[in-house]
């Protein structure tokens, strides 16, 4: 698809931080940074109704603590990311099945990250991490495609594609779970190595309208890696291994899309929406698939 766009983006991305080594086992740190991101080509080609996509800007504030002593280490990190014109997925797909993003004027991501690791023996280690977060858009307005009772697109009186706006307010950001956790148990003994990785992801919304019928359910999935390393004449070493994904055969969806429509009274060729058009109901549709 040809594009006739001539835009220049000039960014200043400062970073600053402090680090305090309390002693050999305890450390504190704090940081501030600014990050900018220009729109991608898809952001331009997928932009059917709104103004041209804008670059996004993030102000990132973080503070944390780490502890390390012998066989054990742990840490905690608190963060607040303040966005201007963040490009977020809106749950829709373009004509070739890629996710569509839109600018939202004000939004934020804030949370706490916890991590810990322990070397239980010389050959066995366990690492875990978890993130609790709150990811929100402020003052969000949803744009719904207008259709008639035959589910055909409706048009304005000047034959532009018609849309209905719906003010949502503060709403969760799509594809942004409130809680995630990972566990990794790893073993390395006399050439044999194995690891069990488990991931938990809480519920996610497929769009930014906070609709319970457009969500991905929470899921927990584990993968097992097994390997063995040995020497072979003429070679330094040989490694053979196998990976079993979804070890416990869990059924889950990790991705999907959603679309919404405003259904107005009208049939057949009557596809013009005017001030007298009667809104019958709004409809949401969600579909799911694995990554």
Task: Describe each model-derived feature in a short phrase.
Residues 4-12, 53-57, 104-108, 173-178, ...:
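Short sequence motifs at beta-strands and strand-loop junctions characteristic
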Residues 1-6, 42-48, 88-100, 139-169, ...:
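Solvent-exposed loop segments that connect transmembrane elements
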Residues 30, 125, 162, 170-291:
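Conserved C-terminal beta-signal and adjacent last beta-strands/turns
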Residues 1, 27, 37-43, 74, ...:
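Outer-membrane beta-barrel proteins
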Residues 80-82, 102-208:
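Gram-negative outer-membrane beta-barrel transporters
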Residues 11, 19-25, 56, 66-70, ...:
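Structural signature of outer-membrane beta-barrel channels/translocons
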Residues 21, 27-33, 54-110, 115-119, ...:
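Membrane-embedded beta-barrel scaffold of Gram-negative outer-membrane proteins
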